[in-house]
From Swiss-Prot:
One Pfam family recorded for the sequence: Flu_NP
Function: Encapsidates the negative strand viral RNA, protecting it from nucleases. The encapsidated genomic RNA is termed the ribonucleoprotein (RNP) and serves as template for transcription and replication. The RNP needs to be localized in the host nucleus to start an infectious cycle, but is too large to diffuse through the nuclear pore complex. NP comprises at least 2 nuclear localization signals that are responsible for the active RNP import into the nucleus through cellular importin alpha/beta pathway.
Family designation: Belongs to the influenza viruses nucleoprotein family.
Keywords: Capsid protein, Helical capsid protein, Host nucleus, Host-virus interaction, Ribonucleoprotein, RNA-binding, Viral nucleoprotein, Viral penetration into host nucleus, Virion, Virus entry into host cell
Recorded superkingdom: Viruses
Record GO cellular component, one term: helical viral capsid
Keyword Ribosomal protein: no
Species of the source: Influenza A virus (strain A/Mallard/New York/6750/1978 H2N2)
GO biological process: symbiont entry into host cell; viral penetration into host nucleus
Protein name: Nucleoprotein
Post-translational modification (record): Late in virus-infected cells, may be cleaved from a 56-kDa protein to a 53-kDa protein by a cellular caspase. This cleavage might be a marker for the onset of apoptosis in infected cells or have a specific function in virus host interaction.
Length: 498
């Protein structure tokens, strides 16, 4: 890991702050989520939502999307320059669900972007509060990570669909800043780079001229972000090669895919944070909680505690299982989509089932779905224990994994061995160790072969009772290692389509 001196904690990235001490970080993160809460309350007032309607997660998502769209400078500029039929570039909106005569009805609302921006700034002491916007993007990204699999996207870039544990944050917009970069998985970064290189191969002007210079800077920056996620010297050296390449082409794509595969065993450091829907912060603010004064952390007990006493509802389709819908949202809140299911189950206190066994579709309701048959139910978002979210890959060791997902990317800092199937992973490394990166490749393969299943990651780290806010008594769970470990095992989840 890089010396702590140069690293900002993710709360600092998220709040755009320079180095702060723990109290200042807690206060600025508190200010950020408090601003989201105040904005949400104001929007509910504007839209005349009842208390129940304001607690509906689908309404929360619509309101979040409106503010993200209102502040999307690039897209707004594009929409103004390329007017398309039926799209007013100055307006934003979406479906709002209301309870009428015992039924749920959908109402499509439209708002001036300028007005939404005004309400957002007003809730955030007159500032743009980009940190809060990024926070909402990460919540949407975590929701996508829990809901969809990215098989098609992986295959398109030449990667193996079983590498889905590396794909955290793959739906985050480009403008999500440092906090967004911190939560992106190795596979996500590799995919972005491969797409860029492919464009360069197909379009000879891509790296040329004034625009090309900017492209090159973006390329090198992305390489550096990815390099920073790797924890071994050989992986980092390979990233230097990719970054310094004169004109990136197929050799670089090969190197990147090699690195992505290696990350299944030599895991990268990927940040995890609990980002909750805006309505949860709104509920807390409405009940008089002062986030800035009390302080808040995205990686400690605070989100767990907030969810313990928030009642959030969701629309449920006729044949969906409300308990499964709750699991989906719980996973989206704490971002363990690629975590070992046994760890998630232990913390949640109820069994977390693999994606393929869930009787539920995504949280968002399509505009053509019939509202007549929609019901709503309370989401069970409480947990039995809490654990600190990690930003390391928890590297030391490995062990058996499953067919649908051949590795995990730990979310919680809890002692265990990390499951993965060495035979499957190593099979991908036959042959090709020649070329400029041969010595590094050989070194990486050697490290992977020497990784021992019996070693334990996060030694001595445990989960904590919800009454133990200072994390003084770690409970180190023992896991039944014969059990299935991965969420996307044997999966038939829907694909994510933009």
């Amino acid at each position: 890991m890089a010396s702590q001196g140069t690293k900002r904690s993710y709360e600092q990235m998220e709040t755009g702050g320079e180095r702060q001490n723990a109290t200042e970080i807690r206060a600025s993160v508190g200010r950020m989520v408090g601003g989201i809460g105040r904005f949400y309350i104001q929007m509910c007032t504007e839209l005349k939502l009842s208390d129940y309607e304001g607690r509906l997660i689908q309404n929360s998502i619509t309101i979040e999307r409106m503010v993200l769209s209102a502040f999307d400078e690039r897209r707004n500029k594009y929409l103004e320059e390329h007017p398309s039929a039926g799209k007013d570039p100055k307006k934003t909106g979406g479906p709002i669900y209301r309870r009428r005569d015992g039924k749920w009805v959908r109402e499509l609302i439209l708002y001036d972007k300028e007005e939404v921006r005004r309400i957002w700034r007003q809730a955030n002491n007159g500032e743009d509060a980009t940190a809060g916007l990024t926070h909402l993007m990460i919540w949407h990204s975590n929701l996508n990570d829990a809901t969809y699999q990215r098989t098609r996207a992986l295959v398109r870039t030449g990667m193996d669909p079983r590498m889905c544990s590396l794909m955290q944050g793959s739906t985050l917009p480009r403008r999500s800043g440092a906090a967004g970069a911190a939560v992106k998985g190795v596979g996500t970064m590799v995919m972005e780079l491969i797409r860029m290189i492919k464009r360069g191969i197909n379009d000879r002007n891509f790296w040329r001229g004034e625009n090309g210079r900017r492209t090159r800077i973006a390329y090198e920056r992305m390489c550096n972000i990815l390099k920073g996620k790797f924890q071994t010297a050989a992986q980092r050296a390979m990233m230097d090669q990719v970054r310094e390449s004169r004109n990136p082409g197929n050799a670089e794509i090969e190197d990147l895919i090699f690195l992505a595969r290696s990350a299944l065993i030599l895991r990268g450091s990927v940040a995890h944070k609990s980002c909750l829907p805006a309505c949860v912060y709104g509920l807390a603010v409405a009940s008089g909680y002062d986030f800035e004064r009390e302080g808040y952390s995205l990686v400690g007990i605070d989100p767990f505690r907030l969810l313990q006493n928030s009642q959030v509802f969701s629309l449920i389709r006729p044949n969906e299982n409300p308990a499964h819908k709750s699991q989906l949202v719980w996973m989206a809140c704490h971002s363990p989509a690629f975590e070992d299911l046994r760890v998630s189950s232990f913390i949640r206190g109820t069994r977390v089932v693999p994606r393929g066994q869930l009787s539920t579709r995504g949280v968002q309701i399509a505009s053509n779905e019939n509202m007549e048959t929609m019901d709503s139910s309370t989401l069970e978002l409480r947990s039995r224990y809490w654990a600190i979210r990690t930003r390391s890959g928890g590297n030391t060791n490995q062990q058996r994994a499953s067919a649908g997902q051949i590795s995990v990317q730990p979310t919680f800092s809890v002692q265990r061995n990390l499951p993965f199937e060495r035979a499957t992973i190593m099979a991908a490394f036959t042959g090709n160790t020649e070329g400029r990166t041969s010595d590094m490749r050989t070194e990486i393969i050697r490290m992977m072969e020497n990784a021992r299943p019996e070693d334990v990651s996060f030694q001595g780290r445990g989960v904590f009772e919800l009454s133990d806010e200072k994390a003084t008594n770690p409970i180190v769970p023992s896991f039944d290692m014969s059990n299935e470990g991965s969420y996307f095992f044997g999966d038939n989840a829907e694909e994510y389509d933009n």
